[in-house]
């Protein structure tokens, strides 16, 4: 399995293979997830003091805050996967 990395803003990089969800931080359930992750010590704040625009949830139960829009992170994730899929179909 190939390791794919994705930039989540300000030079912060996350393993794309570990991402389960990329969501907006506006809803009450997501705010609750952020609070619970902070209490458990599983919160990673990659916003550099800026407003949180995306919440990334990983398969290891880490919650990552990013200052980049969820759509932007998702677009970067999809554009990383597209070349790999093209290589696989060529084989």
Curated annotation (Swiss-Prot):
PANTHER family cross-referenced by the UniProt entry: REGULATORY PROTEIN SSL2874-RELATED, REGULATORY PROTEIN TM_1690-RELATED
UniProt-recorded name of the protein: Putative regulatory protein PTH_1796
Family recorded in the similarity comment: Belongs to the RemA family.
One of the Pfam families matching this protein, by short name: RemA-like
Organism whose genome encodes this protein: Pelotomaculum thermopropionicum (strain DSM 13744 / JCM 10971 / SI)
Superkingdom of this protein's organism: Bacteria
């Amino acid at each position: 399995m190939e390791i794919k990395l994705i930039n989540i803003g300000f030079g912060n990089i996350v393993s794309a293979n570990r991402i389960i969800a990329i969501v907006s931080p506006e809803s009450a359930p997501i705010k609750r997830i952020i609070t619970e992750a902070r209490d458990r010590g599983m919160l990673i704040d990659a916003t550099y003091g800026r407003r949180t625009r995306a919440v990334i949830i990983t398969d290891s139960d880490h919650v990552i805050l990013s200052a980049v829009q969820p759509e932007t992170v998702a677009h970067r994730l999809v554009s990383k996967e597209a070349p790999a899929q093209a290589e696989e179909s060529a084989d």
